[in-house]
Amino acid sequence: MLHKSRQEFLKHGEAVFGRATGFALLANLALFPDRFPPSARTITRAYAYRFWRPANAGEWIDIIVAALLWPLAVVASIVWLTCRHGGVVRDQFGRSRIQQCGDQFRLAFTSGLLPPWYYVFELYRPGELKKGRAFLTRGGTKHSTMKMLARARGSASPLDDKEAFARFCAKRQLRTLPVLFSVHCGELRGTVGADCGFEADLFLKPVCGRGGKGAERWDYRGNGFYRSVGGQMLSAPELIDRVRELSRFQPYLVQGRAKNHHGLRDLSNDALSTVRILTALNEEDRPEIIGAVLKMAVSNNVTTDNVHAGAIAAPIDIEHGRLGQATYSGFDPRKGWIDRHPQSGALITGRTLPLWDELRSLALKAHSAFGDWMIVGWDIAILEDGPTLVEGNCGADIDLVQRPLRTAFGSSRLGELMAFHLDRTEHIWRV
């Protein structure tokens, strides 16, 4: 009960945050539509339609809470973030703290971008502030227009359920990490004995989890024992019991721990580094690669490569598979951009990924199989024997890719395609 209450609280907190980006954005769209890039204008108009048509009382509450908190939250965020980061930006770019405050107020009241994104998208750089309206946010995509497109297209192939995803891929000969077994409310599903029987490193994660939350790594130490990243030792039956207990809150699945291709291991920090490759259906309903980044775990994280959990990401030249400078999430401008991995010292910038053509082909083939979705963010691992699907995300976090690529998607190819499909399906999602 406590777990479900916490999940519900976090869900509404994220929804309130998303709604808070909408007030000024929608007001400016109504007053000054020509100030928005054409694609961003179309996307924001669709967002406006969804914004003012809450599906239930909970969404009305989210709007009311966001409206009450938004002005105070904007002011408080500006003061706190400028105190925290203003000195670094002033020293590196010559933008005074007063100017930074003014920039953040302007962004919040003209584009809906809340103060943290001023630093995430580095809009303090000369000439960058004017691009604010072209950046797409979670509120305007993941929590609204992406869902509208999914409903309009009748999207139903399993991207949210990792267990069903693996089965779906296996039936279509798509390389993916196999599921050894799953546990639902304490019940084991799949072929597994009481002693577990897998003399290999294991990886546990929620069937419907996101962001790497709840994932656990257990390395096989021999004689039927497994060791966690934190040093806990469990026998095989004890590990089964642990998964049973975890599954009482949400279903879990167990996979063998995959390891990167030898040409990438010095960038992985002993976790599994994956390529987040964003694909979208074009005007002819054929998948097209929009952009890609390589995610890499750093510091003490040897379990997941999630950027929001502190990992770094490097942009990938989609034609040749060449890496650019890597970056953190951007919430701390002191960290900036780096050419080498912080722990291993291995070169990132200019490096070419192995098996890149095969990875691109797999992403396009996968989207063809999941063709009822307009946009998918694929996590693909480059293993010794080839690229392998880890998961697909129907609600891909746009900010995860916009920052490393230094691209505002509202004025890019993705924006064009989203606008095209929103226009084409308007007669459906307006019903």
Where are these regions (language model features)?
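Conserved N-proximal alpha/beta basic substrate-recognition cap immediately N-terminal to
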Residues: 60-197, 209-210, 363
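Glycine-rich phosphate-binding loop of ATP-grasp-fold ATP-dependent ligases
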Residues: 202-239
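Glycine-rich phosphate/pyrophosphate-binding beta-alpha loops
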Residues: 212, 274, 295-301, 393-405
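Acidic/His-leaning functional-site neighborhoods
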Residues: 295-320, 324-369
